[in-house]
Every structure is written in structure tokens, then in C-alpha cells.
Amino acid sequence: MMMPSHNVRILVATQPVDFRKGHDGLAALVQSVLREAPFTGTVFVFRAKRADRLKILFWDGSGLVMAYKRLEETTFTWPAVRNGVMTLNRAQFEALFAGLDWRKVRALETRRPAAAE
């Protein structure tokens, strides 16, 4: 999956959205409903009413990128439906995108060394 930098912020809209929306419709939803800025490089993940579909929207510096995925034989594991957004780390997002249960994924804690040895 092509994505912006490794340290990207990933937000999942927990409420299903109308999947007829394209780039502009989803960007407007990010601003009006999620109260976020769509042109910051943040990755926004949207779900359809059917749990087997997702859309991803992010700004890559020169334009809005939108990806759509439909699973053939299973459904995505989604958070409980409620108003708002939730944050995923990169490892959890990759598990979600692969159709795996992202709730079982924990990223390793990374920290910058204080000094070279």
C-alpha cells in the first residue's frame, strides 16, 4: 500500500459514510464532520455500511489520493459504530487493510538513541 511517511497520523471515521462520495466529498466530510484538516498528510480511513469495504483519503503534497478496497471473502474488523474518529498506528492500519484483526496488533515502542556508542 502506498502511503505517506512512516510516522503518518491515521484516523478512522467510526461512522459509516456514503461510498458514492469521491475525493471532494470525503474531504468536505473530514472538515465538517470530523473537524480535521484534509490537506495535512493525515490518512483518513472510511467504512461503508457493508463491513467489507473501505476508502482511504490523504493529501500527498500535490493532490488528494483516494484508494478503495473491497474484501472478497470476509469483512474488515471495525471499531464500534459511534460518532467521531479513532487513531490507529501504522501496524494496526496495515493489519486492518490486509483484512486482519487490527485489535491484536501492537507496534514496538521506538525511541531515538540518546547518543551513538
What annotation goes with each model-predicted range?
Residues 1-117:
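Polybasic/polar functional segments that serve as interface/processing modules
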